[in-house]
């Protein structure tokens, strides 16, 4: 992108945490829209179509390679029941001499047995406080 003159912002930001997060978010969103077009048989997707695309998102190692992002992030599979995917975390450390972030751990699994009930409880409370009827079922 930058080599073709299409980059935005400072090229030195490439590889920084926020840059990488933006790249991953853009890739997931693009793949979800691609799924939405396939699922609904249209290039003119609406919000609910994109939701369905996200809920059928499966970016495995092969797809990461095809996208030119091998080892950039971990594979992700999103479903209606699980909007987070694997919910992994890693730790990075700033190297002041090289002026770059370095991954200092691999990816760890989150403590779903602890976190999921808290998310469910808070989500139900939010829905009740705001008069929202929680969605039931995951049919397209």
Locate predicted features.
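Segments of small-molecule ligand-sensing domains
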Residues: 2-19, 30-104, 110
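Extracytoplasmic/secretory soluble proteins
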Residues: 23-27
């Amino acid at each position: 992108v930058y080599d073709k003159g299409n980059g935005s912002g400072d090229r030195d930001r490439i590889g920084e945490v926020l840059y990488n997060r933006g790249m991953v978010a853009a890739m997931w969103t693009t793949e979800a829209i691609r799924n939405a077009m396939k699922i609904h048989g249209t290039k003119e997707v609406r919000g609910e179509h994109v939701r369905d695309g996200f809920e059928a998102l499966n970016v495995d190692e092969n797809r990461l390679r095809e996208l030119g992002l091998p080892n950039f992030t971990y594979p992700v599979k999103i479903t209606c029941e699980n909007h987070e995917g694997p919910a992994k975390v890693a730790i990075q450390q700033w190297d002041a001499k090289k002026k770059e972030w370095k991954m200092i751990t691999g990816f760890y699994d989150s403590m779903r047995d602890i976190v999921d009930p808290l998310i469910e409880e808070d989500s139900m409370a939010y829905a009740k406080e705001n008069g929202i009827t929680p969605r039931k079922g995951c049919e397209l």
